Amino acid sequence: MPPPSLAMVSGQALPAFLLCSTLLVIKMYAVAVITGQVRLRKKAFANPEDALRHGGLQFHRDDQDVERCLRAHRNDMETIYPFLFLGLVYSFLGPDPFVAQMHFLVFFLGRMVHTVAYLGKLRAPTRSLAYTVAQLPCASMALQIVWEAARHL
């Protein structure tokens, strides 16, 4: 007998969560690579040893574009890590597959737009709207998890 697939174990919620989560982690890696590329292009290094390697201590400095990349990455960590926990737990509550997929998709798209808005310096309120939209499914999942946990006390 073949081993059960993810879809058989948890309906369609877990595979959708795993897809969106993995794509978001890849996006975080991409932002980290972009940050490194901006550092090299702008010759703005956080560590003296890196500055020495790339031209001298005068390049041990801050840069607005590098700082923007770092803020985008920090914001990813502040939102994507909680999503990873909430989405995984939510997947095992047996949610309606379509509703779960919409939760994951809305979060994913919101974070993608947020990153493009942040790194691309798009006009306000694009970034804040994307942030807010992405937080709605997280709030929904958190409330459902709390409700289910409280029901079983």
From Swiss-Prot:
Ranges of the Cytoplasmic topological domain: 43-61, 121-124
Annotated site, Essential for protaglandin-E synthase activity, chain positions = 50, 127
Which pathway does the protein contribute to?
A: Lipid metabolism; prostaglandin biosynthesis
Q: What InterPro entries would the database entry show? A: MAPEG-like_dom_sf, Membr-assoc_MAPEG, MGST1-like
What terms describe the molecular function in GO for this protein? glutathione binding; glutathione peroxidase activity; glutathione transferase activity; prostaglandin-E synthase activity
Q: Where does it localize?
A: Membrane; Cytoplasm, Perinuclear region
* Enzyme Commission number, as recorded: 5.3.99.3, 1.11.1.-, 2.5.1.18
Keywords from the named record: Cytoplasm, Fatty acid biosynthesis, Fatty acid metabolism, Isomerase, Lipid biosynthesis, Lipid metabolism, Membrane, Oxidoreductase, Prostaglandin biosynthesis, Prostaglandin metabolism, Transferase, Transmembrane, Transmembrane helix
Q: What cofactor does this protein call for?
A: glutathione
Membrane topology per record: Multi-pass membrane protein
The membrane-spanning stretches of this chain are: 14-42, 62-91, 97-120, 125-153
Reaction(s) catalyzed by this protein?
prostaglandin H2 = prostaglandin E2; 2-glyceryl-prostaglandin H2 = 2-glyceryl-prostaglandin E2; prostaglandin G2 = (15S)-15-hydroperoxy-prostaglandin E2; 1-chloro-2,4-dinitrobenzene + glutathione = 2,4-dinitrophenyl-S-glutathione + chloride + H(+)
Name the positions where glutathione binds.
Answer: 39, 74-78, 114, 118, 127-131
Residues in the Lumenal compartment per record: 1-13, 92-96
Read off the PANTHER family from this record.
MICROSOMAL GLUTATHIONE S-TRANSFERASE 1 (PTHR10689), PROSTAGLANDIN E SYNTHASE (PTHR10689:SF9)
Subunit structure of this entry? Homotrimer.
The protein depicted here goes by the name Prostaglandin E synthase
